[in-house]
Amino acid sequence: MREIVHIQTGQCGNQIGTKFWEIISDEHGIQPTGEYTTGVEKDLMELQLERINVYYNEGNQGKYVPRAVLVDLEPGTMDSVRAGPHGQLFKPDSFVFGQSGAGNNWAKGHYTEGAELVDSVLDVVRKKSEKCDCLQGFQLTHSLGGVTGSGMGTLLVSKILEEFPDRIMVTFSVVPSPKVSDTVVEPYNATLSIHQLVENTDETYCIDNEALYDICFRTLKLQNPTYGDLNHLVSLTMSGVTTCLRFPGQLNADLRKLAVNMVPFPRLHFFMPGFAPLTARGSQQYRALTVPELTQQMFDAKNMMAACDPRHGRYLTVAAIFRGRMSMREVDDQMYNIQNKNSSFFVEWIPNNVKTAVCDIPPRGLKMSATFIGNSTAIQELFKRVSEQFTAMFRRKAFLHWYTGEGMDEMEFTEAESNMNDLVSEYQQYQEATADDEAEFEEEGEVEGEYD
């Protein structure tokens, strides 16, 4: 089987990671104790168990154990996961934690405190990987604004890549926003992390607290959304994005196939996820949605989990995952209509850049749903926002002594800043590129070659 090792780091990473395990355990019929309860229909049972090995190991007495590693620099988060409803699901040796915490300092997570803990984490990752028949890759949930998730999370990514250079690395990264800020130095932590992710990951889903809050206020009409509400939205998206990996299907059935379809240039692997229909926790969707409504909602800027407007950029590639009993023909027609009506929002130099998959099993409580993964040049808005905040502080060298005190060099900040600005320019370059530009690029290349 094509197994995935899941790693969750830091408080945010552990909270969204645990919520993800709750939701997929429910979809696969796995109880909080790890036991499988037989599906009502035999067909459903086969679908639930056919690819269960992608995320679970089968333990003794027929129990299923998540192939997960839970990491934090302080024990608090682990205690709350253990005490939670699904705490019994994880093996005790999957928890790796320090005692100190990293006090919102990226350098502590990446160079000092985190570096001391990283070997114990790699041991657990190694053990889990060795038990796999055919490991396809790793997925990491973390936030970029905190410390353990950003500093230690990116350290883990680079260490794992050293050992498993040919496996796929996917991250679900929560990007900080000024509206929902825990600490002043979030722009520093995020910029230093993105500097690492650009080079070291194959796919990064950008989840944005600002977008999640907007969805809670505008769409779900929640007056005081909690982190629980935000995590609920994230876990819906994660469940949707991983549907093709967990259930039998043809399209994007493993991480590498998804990467090949979605990433036209290696650095441009930051995706904008979306979900439809959006529902609040605990509420049931009473009105059944039609496929046209789902498709419309899915492409709507208000449904995006990253705070950027796709209408300000162009889609390089798109993957859509529909779930529930529906007509494939209708899905294809609707997707075709969207592309035709909005052709200016899709780059014309990648033909067939929208891929659609359909899975029969809908999420709990819904008749049908759709998950959207877009590689859009509009994601540069998100990087610009972080970059502006970074520059404002870095120009005054504010808070820098906390980082240099842990052995970091100012040069690393300058490099991270310019790498992020380069990323923004690359997105801009491909946003403006047209199919006719190709000939010009080739001619330039030939001329340069002559002068070499």
UniProtKB/Swiss-Prot annotation:
SUPFAM superfamilies: Tubulin C-terminal domain-like, Tubulin nucleotide-binding domain-like
Pfam families (UniProt xref): Tubulin, Tubulin_C
Cellular component terms per the entry's GO annotation: cytoplasm; microtubule
GO molecular function: GTP binding; GTPase activity; metal ion binding; structural constituent of cytoskeleton
Locations listed in the record: Cytoplasm, Cytoskeleton
One GO biological process term: microtubule-based process
Cofactor(s) required for function per UniProt: Mg(2+)
Biased composition (Acidic residues): 434-452
Similarity section: Belongs to the tubulin family.
Described function: Tubulin is the major constituent of microtubules, a cylinder consisting of laterally associated linear protofilaments composed of alpha- and beta-tubulin heterodimers. Microtubules grow by the addition of GTP-tubulin dimers to the microtubule end, where a stabilizing cap forms. Below the cap, tubulin dimers are in GDP-bound state, owing to GTPase activity of alpha-tubulin.
Protein name (Swiss-Prot/TrEMBL): Tubulin beta-2 chain
Source organism: Homarus americanus (American lobster)
